[in-house]
UniProtKB/Swiss-Prot annotation:
An example molecular function term from Gene Ontology annotations: O-palmitoyltransferase activity
Chief subcellular location: membrane
Designated name of the protein: Lipid A acyltransferase PagP
Sites annotated Role in lipopolysaccharide recognition: K88
Record key words, sorted: Acyltransferase, Cell outer membrane, Membrane, Signal, Transferase
EC class (word): transferase
NCBIfam families assigned to the protein according to its UniProt record, in alphabetical order: PRK11045.1
Entry-linked HAMAP family: PagP_transferase
Reaction catalysed by this enzyme: a lipid A + a 1,2-diacyl-sn-glycero-3-phosphocholine = a hepta-acyl lipid A + a 2-acyl-sn-glycero-3-phosphocholine; a lipid IVA + a 1,2-diacyl-sn-glycero-3-phosphocholine = a lipid IVB + a 2-acyl-sn-glycero-3-phosphocholine; a lipid IIA + a 1,2-diacyl-sn-glycero-3-phosphocholine = a lipid IIB + a 2-acyl-sn-glycero-3-phosphocholine
Organism (species): Photorhabdus laumondii subsp. laumondii (strain DSM 15139 / CIP 105565 / TT01)
Induction: Induced during magnesium-deficient conditions.
Length: 207
């Protein structure tokens, strides 16, 4: 167990550092692209892959340079009881103790962008890191001042003990209910019977 925890922490730190390097490189490249674009006629993003990739890079760069910060506190990992045998859910961990940090911004449409890193205890009570980029389309319900609701996606990379901590790409949906600086945010991980089909959620505080 001591070896597993040491290895997990080492690999988690490596994943977080390398991801930060990737984000920084992407942000730097995108900033150069933005400088070039500003000296020419503004481009319009169509449906072609190069424009989408350039738009993604620009969003990463703007988020990386944003002065705003977020903290994440994982609160629940719920295994869908309709897709699991009871003997499995009885022994699975559903309290994902952990912590995370991110940088965020709201764009001109009030949509949320974030670059984040989080580590928590998975269903088998093993350390699991995750890093990625998140986007949510935000909606303000009626005249409820301070409240926001959002739905979107995250493009992330995780690593798990049962897969020997090999980095795994993990695109997932995102949702949130927010009031002022506090949010309840989560994702649903799809899967098959006795695998996946997990609701994972956390509290998010911005400053």
């Amino acid at each position: 167990m001591k070896f597993d925890l040491t290895a997990a922490c080492t690999l988690s730190a490596t994943l977080l550092v390398s991801s930060g390097t990737v984000f920084a490189t992407t942000a730097n490249t995108a900033n150069k692209s933005l400088t070039t674009i500003e000296s020419h006629t503004p481009i319009s993003y169509g449906n072609n892959s190069s424009s989408l990739w350039e738009k993604f890079n620009n969003n990463v760069a703007l988020t990386w340079d944003a002065p705003n910060n977020e903290l994440y506190l994982p609160v629940i990992t719920w295994h869908n009881r309709h897709t699991y045998d009871k003997e499995k859910t009885d022994r699975y961990n559903e309290r994902p103790w952990g912590f995370g940090y991110g940088k965020y911004r709201y764009d001109e449409d009030n949509d949320w962008h974030s670059l984040y890193a989080m580590a928590f205890m998975d269903s088998h009570n093993r350390l699991e890191p995750i890093v990625g980029y998140g986007f949510q389309k935000m909606w303000i319900p009626g005249d409820l001042e301070g409240f926001r609701m959002g739905i979107g996606f995250t493009l992330s990379v995780t690593a798990r003990h049962d897969y020997y901590y090999v980095p795994i790409p993990l695109p997932l949906p995102l949702f949130s209910i927010e009031y002022d600086r506090l949010s309840f945010q989560g994702t649903y991980i799809p899967g098959t019977y006795n695998n996946g089909n997990v609701l994972f959620a956390w509290l998010r505080w911005q400053w």
